[in-house]
UniProtKB/Swiss-Prot annotation:
PANTHER family: IMIDAZOLONEPROPIONASE, IMIDAZOLONEPROPIONASE-RELATED
Protein name: Imidazolonepropionase
Cofactor binding, per record: Binds 1 zinc or iron ion per subunit.
Catalytic activity: 4-imidazolone-5-propanoate + H2O = N-formimidoyl-L-glutamate
One of the GO BP terms on file: L-histidine catabolic process to glutamate and formamide
Gene (UniProt): hutI
Described purpose of this protein according to its UniProt entry: Catalyzes the hydrolytic cleavage of the carbon-nitrogen bond in imidazolone-5-propanoate to yield N-formimidoyl-L-glutamate. It is the third step in the universal histidine degradation pathway.
Main localization of the protein described in the UniProt heading: cytoplasm
Length: 403
């Protein structure tokens, strides 16, 4: 009888705050971390009776990385719009000519489930290739009942196909469905009364998100959707304070939001309300870069008041066409002046909090699922120093090496 399934020795690791630890051992049993800590404190029975053991030679082991904000499922792309933007055409003019988000909506509606899988699976596999073991995927390019459900179904299937843990987020409130043009309130009513309950009844939704902004949904409409989610016992998230300060972060915090995302225009009141609600700030440097934004999220304020900060790709065709969480880590250091430990925590522990999964994943602690990444480096700073490099040496999901 073996005391454990896998014993990892002579490793460097990081703690939940992102600080590096040396001479560490990790014990894996039945897909979870049985024990972890300094190797000189390793209980003898694990050392004597391990089914398998690996000498890591001082190389870094992190928790499996977590991309906690993506719009990964969609059809087509918007490269033609990128060309127009470079020629000086405004986003408003692009939208008036049929471009923008509604062009992605049309392409996504036109695609079958199989076509969506064919186009989206490579994006998920690209994240997996960087050591990402958990991904949040939003709907929001269907904007009607049939196609929002289709997107959520595809997201679930992608997780099974890729061997990646997928959490789904219903983002029907991404934009107003074209059938409801000029009547956003009727769309919100339909979303709350028909779309969201259907997604819940089919077990397709884990969380609910709203894009609360002057160009999207009002505070009153966001609250209506949050209340509908609460009535269905679904946790909420919010695209908040990206383009202006509407007070969306305070509203979301009042409903116990797991996270508020973007936050370039967050003020102190919103940050304090987020602290009280234990709400995570999800920062999205890819969108900041691609949109050439000038206003940075208030990282110093978030630090001062104690809001946990996560980082994600925001992978989407309109404002962050990337599948590299490693690149986002480097960008967060350079653009947002985040420290290396902050960034490492942001894509592990804080990202798990943003998904409400911190009891199971996000840090190397006894009792948690054994999602781990072994890197061919010894200094954790290298993960932020390089651009989208190095790739993992090996990745473990639930106690099994998958690469």
């Amino acid at each position: 009888m073996f005391a454990c399934d896998e014993l990892l020795l002579n490793a460097s690791t990081i703690d939940a705050t992102g600080l590096q630890l040396s001479n560490q051992a990790i014990v894996i049993k039945k897909g979870r971390i049985e024990w972890c800590g300094s190797e000189d404190q390793l209980p003898a029975h694990f050392q004597e009776s391990a089914k398998s053991r690996k000498d890591c030679h001082g190389q870094l082991i992190t928790p499996g990385l977590i991309d906690c904000h993506t719009h990964l499922v969609y059809a087509g792309h918007r490269a033609a719009e990128f060309r127009l933007k470079l020629q000086g055409v405004s986003y408003a003019d692009i939208a008036k000519s049929g471009g923008g988000i509604l062009s992605t909506v049309q392409m996504t509606r036109d695609a079958s489930e199989e076509e969506l899988i064919d186009q989206s699976l490579p994006r998920l596999l690209a994240l997996k290739n960087e050591g990402v073991t958990t991904v949040e995927i939003k709907s929001g390019y269907g904007l009607d009942l049939q196609n929002e459900l289709k997107m959520l179904k595809v997201a679930r299937q992608l997780g099974e196909m890729a061997g990646v843990r997928v959490k789904t987020t219903f983002l029907g409130a991404h934009a107003v469905g074209p059938e409801f043009k000029g009547n956003s309130q009727a769309y919100v009513d339909f979303l709350c009364n028909e779309m969201l309950p259907a997604a819940k009844n089919m077990d397709l939704v884990d969380t609910v998100d709203v894009f609360c902004e002057s160009i999207a949904f009002s505070i009153r409409q966001a609250e209506q959707i949050f209340q509908a989610a609460k009535d269905l016992n679904l946790p909420i998230k919010c695209h908040a304070e990206q383009l202006s300060n509407m007070g969306a972060s305070s509203l979301a915090a009042r409903y116990g939001a797991l996270s508020c995302d973007h936050l370039e225009f967050l003020d102190e009141n919103g940050a304090l309300n987020m602290v009280k609600a234990n709400t995570v700030a999800v920062l999205l440097p890819g969108a900041f870069y691609f949109l050439k934004e000038k206003q940075k999220p208030p990282v110093d304020l978030l630090r001062q008041v104690g809001v946990g900060m996560a980082i994600a790709t925001d992978s989407n065709p309109g404002s962050s066409p990337t599948t590299s969480l490693l690149l986002m880590m480097s960008m967060a250091c350079q653009f947002f002046s985040m420290s290396i430990p902050e960034v490492l925590s942001a894509v592990t522990y804080q990202a798990s909090r943003a998904l409400g999964m911190e009891k199971d994943i996000g840090s190397i602690e006894a009792g948690k699922i054994a999602d781990l990444v072994l890197w061919s480096i010894k200094d954790s700073a290298a993960l932020c120093y390089y651009f989208a490099y190095p790739l993992p040496h090996q990745t473990m999901v639930a106690g099994e090496w998958v690469s």
